[in-house]
Curated annotation (Swiss-Prot):
The gene is RRT14. It is found in: Nucleus, Nucleolus. The keyword Mitochondrion does not apply. GO terms for cellular component: nucleolus. Pfam families: RRT14. Keywords: Nucleus, Transcription, Transcription regulation. Residues 28-53, 59-78, 180-218 are annotated as: Disordered. This is Regulator of rDNA transcription 14. Belongs to the RRT14 family.
Length: 218
């Protein structure tokens, strides 16, 4: 078969090779060579050695990122401290301003408002701190408060014995007073019980040797 040119011959050979490859499911030597060249180029691009300068650049970049993160942390900590000191100074200035004793004529309306606000705030904080965790004690205290209020509305004046448990407290106080009357500070009996059947110069309850009860009767 004669061809007009080399290009037409090359094209005809390619078409025939493609037909055979499709029928027989085989690869032509040209296609094999093409695939080999492609893989070679890929391996060349993959196994490209890294220069020492590139390594140094990479190390510097990583160190720069670390230093930047450290500086950011330091700045954040410094700002935090500054804000804390500013708040403390503000609180201290308010404390000096409003705890300074002034006359009512000198105080302005804004001062009075702020003082009332400050008082309420302090009362709330104290109530939170003094809140009793034990429910039983809290209930007992509430009961005593209610009883005191009820007695106050009925009588007007509230004493120790007006609420439950007051009688016991009163008895306890009376017993303590009696004990204090019976003994002086040195452990000796100081009331009339000790003076009965006692004589000067002797221990309480003993009489002198020459003492006779008949003389006492005379």
């Amino acid at each position: 078969m004669s061809f007009n040119s080399k290009a037409s011959k090359y094209q005809a050979e390619n078409t025939v090779d493609k037909l055979f490859s499709n029928i027989l499911h085989t690869t032509t030597p040209k296609s094999v060579s093409n695939t080999n060249t492609k893989t070679k180029t890929k391996t060349k691009t993959k196994t490209k050695p890294i220069s020492s300068t590139q390594l140094l650049v990479n190390q510097l970049q990583s160190s720069n990122t670390n230093s930047n993160s450290n500086t950011k942390r330091k700045k954040h900590n410094i700002n935090k401290r500054i804000n804390k000191t500013l708040l403390e100074e503000k609180k201290f200035s308010k404390f000096i301003k409003y705890n300074h004793i002034k006359q009512k004529s000198i105080k302005s309306e804004s001062d009075e408002k702020y003082l009332h606000k400050l008082i309420r705030k302090n009362i709330n904080s104290l109530n939170k701190i003094n809140k009793i965790d034990d429910l039983l004690i809290d209930e007992e205290l509430n009961q005593i408060k209610l009883e005191l209020l009820a007695n106050e509305s009925n009588v007007g004046n509230v004493g120790i014995g007006h609420f439950k448990g007051g009688k016991r407290l009163r008895k306890k106080l009376l017993n303590n007073n009696k004990e204090q009357e019976e003994f002086d500070g040195f452990g000796n009996i100081s009331n009339n019980k000790g003076k009965k059947n006692s004589h000067p110069g002797l221990t309480p309850g003993l009489a002198p040797v020459d003492y006779e009860e008949e003389e006492e009767e005379e």
